[in-house]
Amino acid sequence: MITRAELLDMLASNAPQGFEAQALGLVPIVVETSGRGERSYDIYSRLLKERLVFMVGEVNDQTANLVVAQLLFLESENPDKDISLYINSPGGSVSAGMAIYDTMQFIKPDVSTLCMGLAASMGAFLLASGAKGKRFALPNSRVMIHQPLGGARGQASDIEIQAREILYLKERLNQLLAQHTGQDVERIARDTDRDNFMSSEDAKAYGLIDQVLLKRP
């Protein structure tokens, strides 16, 4: 039987996104008993067995690697069964978010998205990128869309290159958001010019989600 200390050491090398290693003691451990004895899971690994993936906290390369790996694993387990992506994120890196986005579109299973708490910036983009008819938000969650942020430094030629890149990303994100919401690109460009916060009902009316969930269906 594995000890709790050994389990925490194992988890520290593969911590769930949004949690630092020092906080692992706060992650619940689930013990399942069967005819073959006991087996311990951290709560996120146990929920992964139910095809639930969590994207919590900043969207960065580490978060993207974890989410992408889980999506690919669940596809290999069953390519015909939906995956649920739970989002509570202030956003973050565009490149990391696009890695998650492209994987969501690439794999065979539909990816259902659900906002709990906050889906802002890239978090909102990924929320809207779920399978059509399977994008949800809880009633008191908030959604925020805006244009990509960037800070250019260096020589004038370097700043010019970075400016062209962020303008390209802005246009590309607007096109994709228009595709997923049904809004025209011009409206998306206007509405993302500054931080644009929405209630879950407003997000539904805008086309970012399909339904506000009061209770589990």
UniProtKB/Swiss-Prot annotation:
GO cellular component terms, A-Z: cytoplasm; endopeptidase Clp complex
GO biological process, one term: protein quality control for misfolded or incompletely synthesized proteins
Catalytic reactions on record: Hydrolysis of proteins to small peptides in the presence of ATP and magnesium. alpha-casein is the usual test substrate. In the absence of ATP, only oligopeptides shorter than five residues are hydrolyzed (such as succinyl-Leu-Tyr-|-NHMec, and Leu-Tyr-Leu-|-Tyr-Trp, in which cleavage of the -Tyr-|-Leu- and -Tyr-|-Trp bonds also occurs)
Keyword field: Cytoplasm, Hydrolase, Protease, Serine protease
Enzyme class: hydrolase
Listed PROSITE patterns: CLP_PROTEASE_HIS, CLP_PROTEASE_SER
Enzyme active site: S121 (nucleophile), H146
EC number: 3.4.21.92
Localization of this protein: Cytoplasm
UniProt family annotation: Belongs to the peptidase S14 family.
Pfam families reported for this sequence: CLP_protease
Assembly, per entry: Fourteen ClpP subunits assemble into 2 heptameric rings which stack back to back to give a disk-like structure with a central cavity, resembling the structure of eukaryotic proteasomes.
Entry protein name: ATP-dependent Clp protease proteolytic subunit
InterPro entries: ClpP (IPR001907), ClpP/crotonase-like_dom_sf (IPR029045), ClpP/TepA (IPR023562), ClpP_His_AS (IPR033135), ClpP_Ser_AS (IPR018215)
General function of this protein: Cleaves peptides in various proteins in a process that requires ATP hydrolysis. Has a chymotrypsin-like activity. Plays a major role in the degradation of misfolded proteins.
GO molecular function, one term: serine-type endopeptidase activity
